[in-house]
C-alpha cells in the first residue's frame, strides 16, 4: 500500500510539472519563457553556404512590413548570425459597416545557427511594442493563462480576447518570418 501511495504521488508530481498549451494557441511557452525554434534540413548544403545566406537575409531590406533589422553578431566560427528585429503587421477588423485597422508591433532577437545540411532559427526575447513601451510577451502570457486583462505601464488595457489576438498575430509573424528565411536559405549565391 505504501508503494502504491508513493507511486501515485510521483505520477501526480510529474503531471503537475508537465508543460501544457493552457491557452490553446500553440505558443512555445516553457520555463517561463517564449522561444520559437525550428530546425530545417537542407540536403547537400554546406555550412558556409547556409551561413552566408543567413547573413545576406539579415543584411537585405525585407519586402514586407519590417520596420528595422539590426545585425548584432556574425560569427563564422560558430556559423551564427544574430539580429534584432522590429516587425509590424497590420490587420483589418470589420466593425459594423466600416473596417478598422490595427497595427501590431513586436521586437525580438533572431538567431540563425548553421551546420552542414541544416540550420536552426530561434526567435526569443520577444517584446510587445506600444508607443514607447516595450513589454515582454511573457507578462502578457501570464495574464492570458490567468484569464485576466493586462494593463500596460502607459494605462492601455488588453482584455483576454485582445491578448488571444496578440498571440495569434505573433504566431502569424513568426510563421511569415520563418517562411521568408527558408526561401532565402536554399538559394545558391555562389559566384
Which residue ranges define each predicted feature?
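Bacterial Sec-dependent N-terminal signal peptides
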Residues: 1-22
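Ser/Thr-rich, low-complexity intrinsically disordered terminal regions
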Residues: 18-191
Amino acid at each position: 500500500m505504501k508503494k502504491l501511495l508513493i507511486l501515485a504521488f510521483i505520477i501526480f508530481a510529474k503531471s503537475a510539472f508537465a508543460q501544457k498549451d493552457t491557452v490553446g494557441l500553440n505558443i512555445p511557452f516553457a520555463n517561463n519563457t517564449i522561444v520559437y525554434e525550428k530546425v530545417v534540413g537542407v540536403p547537400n548544403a554546406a555550412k558556409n553556404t547556409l551561413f552566408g545566406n543567413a547573413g545576406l537575409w539579415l543584411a537585405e531590406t525585407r519586402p514586407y512590413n519590417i520596420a528595422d533589422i539590426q545585425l548584432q553578431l556574425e560569427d563564422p566560427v560558430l556559423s551564427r548570425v544574430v539580429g534584432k528585429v522590429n516587425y509590424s503587421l497590420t490587420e483589418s477588423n470589420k466593425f459594423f459597416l466600416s473596417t478598422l485597422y490595427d497595427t501590431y508591433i513586436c521586437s525580438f532577437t533572431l538567431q540563425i545557427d548553421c551546420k552542414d545540411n541544416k540550420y536552426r532559427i530561434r526567435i526569443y526575447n520577444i517584446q510587445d511594442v506600444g508607443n514607447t513601451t516595450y513589454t515582454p510577451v511573457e507578462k502578457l502570457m501570464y495574464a492570458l493563462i490567468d484569464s485576466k486583462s493586462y494593463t500596460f505601464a502607459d494605462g492601455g488595457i488588453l482584455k483576454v480576447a485582445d491578448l488571444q489576438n496578440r498571440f495569434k498575430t505573433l504566431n502569424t509573424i513568426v510563421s511569415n518570418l520563418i517562411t521568408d528565411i527558408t526561401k532565402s536559405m536554399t538559394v545558391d549565391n555562389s559566384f
